[in-house]
């Protein structure tokens, strides 16, 4: 990887495909460098892990309920047999409120199933201002490709 990575080709490929699979060097640094370049180009960015994502569309764009762990406590007769449901604010919906495009950088993407990856790609098609970068593992050098070509 060159010392000064301009990020122009990465940004062009991200705008063209909407969803990218990326392999980054294990020593780190490449992802934050690219995120800085994207912020300088006018994108809003958010970095998060895919572990515990569940349904990607509901988690990222819709108000949804979760059931917190009970930790052995009993709440008999108050909330039913399944426990209480807490409403969680969507992760990306507030970022899409403005005019700027949003880049969602997802770590540990190798744990995602093929259907979850396809649903993330479909999210980019539904919302053209949302761009998603998924880290699919480590490599000796920084490389990326379209997510649809990666899963085939």
Curated annotation (Swiss-Prot):
**Bilayer topology annotation:** Peripheral membrane protein
* EC number(s) stated in the UniProt entry for this protein: 7.1.1.-
Cite a GO CC annotation.
Answer: plasma membrane-derived thylakoid membrane
Enzyme type, top EC level: translocase
Localization annotation: Cellular thylakoid membrane
Q: Which InterPro entries match?
A: NAD(P)H-quinone_OxRdtase_su_N
Q: List the Pfam families hit by this protein, alphabetically.
A: NdhN (PF11909)
What's the subunit arrangement here?
Answer: NDH-1 can be composed of about 15 different subunits; different subcomplexes with different compositions have been identified which probably have different functions.
Q: What is this protein called?
A: NAD(P)H-quinone oxidoreductase subunit N
């Amino acid at each position: 990887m060159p010392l000064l990575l301009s990020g122009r080709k990465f940004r062009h490929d991200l705008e063209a495909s909407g969803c990218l699979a990326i392999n980054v060097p294990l020593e780190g640094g490449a992802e934050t460098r690219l995120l800085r370049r994207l912020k300088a180009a006018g994108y809003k960015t958010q970095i998060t892990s895919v572990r515990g994502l569940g349904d990607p569309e509901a988690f990222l764009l819709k108000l949804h309920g979760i059931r917190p762990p009970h930790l052995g406590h009993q709440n008999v007769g108050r909330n039913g047999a399944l426990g209480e449901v807490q409403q969680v604010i969507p992760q990306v919906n507030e970022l899409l409120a403005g005019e700027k495009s949003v880049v969602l950088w997802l770590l540990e993407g190798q744990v995602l199933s093929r259907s979850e990856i396809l649903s993330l790609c479909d999210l980019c098609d539904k919302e053209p201002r949302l761009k998603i970068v998924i880290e699919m593992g480590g490599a000796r050098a920084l490389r990326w490709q379209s997510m649809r070509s990666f899963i085939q």
